[in-house]
């Protein structure tokens, strides 16, 4: 996967699908499957964020996976059942991109939750549940929801994986490259990481890493990427925006 700045929501959706495909390859080729709901990796991301970026932080976590009909429920019934098991309101039905979609937008303990279930075919659907928070209390609540939602997806027969992106700013006018060096120094103090891919332009530096201690990963060529870091200079404010993704970034940076 090329490591570059995602431009726009449509591309972000494509990236999410590519992440899921990479997860499928990675999980299928593991002798022991990675944990589907390892809260320690999310706490590791928060710890890194507290060290390398200034507050406020924005954290986005996405669960995503496939559902296949088993003859007992149609997609609408299954979407309603999953929404109830997540303690969310009933789904709203709409058509998006020519596909029936069932959606819920809600807030849980200050965490913004977006539930999206889209029918791909008569007996197959694709689900993305996104949680977003900022601030210490909300970040703690999101960590709990991440684990709860992973368990609920599993109990509803959906083999899902999660990814997370943390975003914050670094004050002061510094080139993206020097900010990236400072961020990397913080990462290397906590874990062994090997740079595997890199992208750079006039205002952005993005690196992807192999991190053996992290169990979540995505296949990219002959490598398994476990973490992506991007630094983007905001020329209007003079500060730099830092985004850290496990295993890769799936929001615009």
Model-derived segments and their meaning:
Residues 1-107:
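N-terminal leader/presequence regions that precede the main folded/catalytic core
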Residues 4-46, 143-160, 179-195, 231-233, ...:
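Soluble, non-membrane globular domain cores that form compact, hydrophobic packing
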Residues 67, 133-137, 170-172, 233, ...:
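Beta-strand elements of well-folded, non-transmembrane domains
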Residues 67-74, 137, 141, 175-179, ...:
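Extracytoplasmic/periplasmic, Sec-exported soluble proteins
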Residues 57-65, 69, 124-132, 240-247:
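Short, hydrophobic/proline-enriched secondary-structure or compact coil segments at domain edges
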Residues 169-223:
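Intrinsically disordered, low-complexity segments enriched in Gly and acidic/Ser/Thr residues
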Residues 214-253:
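A cross-kingdom marker for long, charged
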Residues 80-176:
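Extracytoplasmic beta-rich ectodomain segments of secreted or membrane-anchored proteins
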